[in-house]
Amino acid sequence: MTIQVKRVVTVFGGTGNQGSSVARSLLAHKAKIFHVRVITRDPQSDKAKAIASLGAELVQADGFNLGEMTNAFAGSWGVFINTNSDDEALKSLDGPSDYDLGVSVIDSAKKAGVQHVVYSSGPSITNATKGRMHLEGFETKYHVEQYGRRKGFTSFTPILCASFMECFFYDPFVDAFGGFPWIPEPETGEVVFRTPDYGGKGDMPWVSCEEDLGDIVHGIFLNPCKYDQVLVQATSQQITMFDVAASYTQATGIPARYEELPSWSSIKLNGTRCRAETRQMFWYMKHCGGRWFAEHESDMSTAVALKESAMLSQDRVGGLVTFQAWFKKAKVLKDQNV
């Protein structure tokens, strides 16, 4: 009898939105070919315990500690890496950056003998605008990607995420767009989605971290060499702002409409980084033809194929989530205050 040896896939950032989605998807493989290991700074956290309850192994390590990280990666066949570029600890000019953290994690994976790496990267807005605009969270990840490409892994696959549907659970994001989809107009009861012109054809790529990102990464790990050095776009749906509002009505029955703001500057500053970066993104999109992925045109074909592969491996049917389906589920969660 042949005993199948499980492939150890270690997830750095495994208690975050991206990492936990990847861990859950891999653990759902019908043949259980993956042993999922999650690196966390706090194994006693509720999020760590939740992912462990599904069958993941927890390992405590600090991303900046080469020894701890090398031990955490020991025996790993594959690694998924996502760092939190919004972490305030990585924002000080006097301290380490998200680039420093990403490089440290990649160096540890290489030292541990990891073969296959999937890295959650970012588009270079600086390159796309010929140096006119810099968004640190994207730029540092882009440069970590370039570093990882040169490290000589058996396969290295950068993945670019579309805008997250789950941002509609984040109050500062919702506030920037007139309260959509949760805050109705007091006079009419309808919800209004207000944004500046997106640019290009007006259709923006979005991804559900919860529903699709993990499956897309799962699909890569099913055939990693096929995606070596391939920039994978993680997109659930490419859709106009008008149709986002229409999808909400179709999902909930609540009247919603889209209202285009005159300019990117119509998004008023309020002292938060979220609001400032949102303004910048809409300036960029308008001036770069609506290209969310910066120098790369949007292409959903790879995401569709990877999702299909993952679902087949899990004995599930279906495909990438639509905003209509996502809003239907999100409204229930919102009403339950989850």
UniProtKB/Swiss-Prot annotation:
The biological pathway it contributes to is: Alkaloid biosynthesis
Domain of life, per lineage: Eukaryota
The record's SUPFAM superfamilies line, in alphabetical order, gives: NAD(P)-binding Rossmann-fold domains
Query: Does the keyword Oxidoreductase belong to this entry?
Result: yes
**Top EC class for this record:** oxidoreductase
Binding sites annotated in the UniProt record for NADP(+) = 13-18, 41-45, 62-63, 83-85, 141, 164-167
Q: GO terms for molecular function, please?
A: oxidoreductase activity
Gene Ontology CC: nucleus
GO terms classed as biological process: alkaloid metabolic process
CDD domains from the UniProt entry? NmrA_like_SDR_a (cd05251)
All disulfide bonds of the chain are: none
**Pfam families documented for this protein:** NmrA
Name the UniProt key words of this record, in alphabetical order: Alkaloid metabolism, NADP, Oxidoreductase
Q: What is its EC number?
A: 1.-.-.-
UniProt family annotation: Belongs to the NmrA-type oxidoreductase family.
| Biological role | NmrA-like family domain-containing oxidoreductase; part of the gene cluster that mediates the biosynthesis of paraherquamide, a fungal indole alkaloid that belongs to a family of natural products containing a characteristic bicyclo[2.2.2]diazaoctane core. The first steps in the biosynthesis of paraherquamide is the production of the beta-methyl-proline precursor from L-isoleucine. They require oxidation of a terminally hydroxylated L-isoleucine to the corresponding aldehyde by enzymes which have still to be identified.
Q: What is this protein called?
A: NmrA-like family domain-containing oxidoreductase phqG
What organism, scientifically named, is this protein from?
Penicillium fellutanum
Encoding gene, per UniProt annotation: phqG
